[in-house]
Regions:
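Short loop/edge segments at beta-strand edges and connector loops
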Residues: 21, 101-102, 171, 194
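Mobile active-site "lid"/loop adjacent to the S-adenosyl-L-methionine
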Residues: 123-152
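Class I SAM-dependent transferase core
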Residues: 2-42
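Conserved beta-strand segments of alpha/beta enzyme cores
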Residues: 18, 70, 96-98, 189-192
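Single conserved hydrophobic/aromatic residue that forms the stacking wall/gate
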Residues: 213-222
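Conserved Class I SAM-dependent methyltransferase catalytic core
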Residues: 147-197, 204
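Conserved SAM/SAH cofactor-binding pocket of Class I
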Residues: 38-111, 115-121, 126-132
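Residue-level signal for inorganic ion chemistry
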Residues: 35, 122, 153, 211
């Protein structure tokens, strides 16, 4: 497998899956692993979208943990998308995981509306005018809402999900109000919200959440 400068192959320690990452780029964290575990109820034969796939970590893990039929990883950065595609090939997942170099806001030119059983995403957590910015452009796009905002991620999820399809997302607790507001605007109902604490007696720092498209649910809090 060809590696570019500053790239390495990391072992995911699960079913012999591996991933290519840049030493100076944005590497996956525990949030992606938690989200892939949270979405293990994805049903056999379903088709989904991974919005902002980055290195392809979520799609690769889901191919190993579920019997999904096909998942499309959408990545706006061309160099990152090309690297993710090599990771797909490295794991022999070409028939199940396809990388598309596109801004999520432009997906209506690629797919029909209401085409997907599920959508999974680990979007940028920070608004552009908040938090410490990183001079590395690739890391900056991964962490801050530069090419797409939370509103954009939820809006395109509404457009692309089938009726009763599921959206899986991980985000920060401080954005929960924004998330619920945008979901309600787009007729997506929260189904389950979990608060993840890094240590006992510490405040939660992550919230994996599942949402259902156009279907009322009693929200479960954990």
């Amino acid at each position: 497998m060809h590696l570019n400068n500053n790239e390495r192959i990391d072992d995911l320690e699960y079913k012999d899956l591996k991933i290519i990452q840049r030493k100076d780029g944005f590497c996956f964290g525990i949030d992606s692993v938690l989200l892939s575990n949270y979405a293990k109820d994805i049903k056999r034969g379903t088709v989904g979208l991974d919005l902002g796939t980055g290195t392809g970590i979520l799609g690769i893990l889901l191919c190993g943990k579920t019997d999904l039929s096909k998942i499309y990883g959408i990545e706006v950065q061309q160099e990152v998308a090309e690297m993710a595609q090599r990771s797909v090939k490295l794991n022999n997942l070409e028939n199940r995981f396809e990388i598309i170099n596109k801004n999520i806001k432009d997906l209506e030119s690629v797919f029909d509306k209401n085409s997907f059983d599920f959508i999974i995403t680990n979007p940028p957590y920070k608004k552009m005018d908040t938090g410490k910015t990183n001079e590395n452009s690739k890391k900056l796009i991964s962490r801050h809402e530069i090419t797409a905002t939370l509103k954009d991620f939820i809006k395109i999820s509404y457009i692309m999900l089938k009726d009763k399809g599921t959206l899986y997302m991980v985000h920060k607790p401080e954005r929960l109000v924004d998330i619920i507001y945008q979901l309600r605007k787009n007729k997506i109902e929260p189904k389950e919200i979990r608060f993840v604490h890094p240590y006992e007696k510490k405040e939660p720092n992550l919230i994996p959440v599942s949402y259902t498209h156009l279907r009322a649910h009693e929200t479960e809090l954990h």
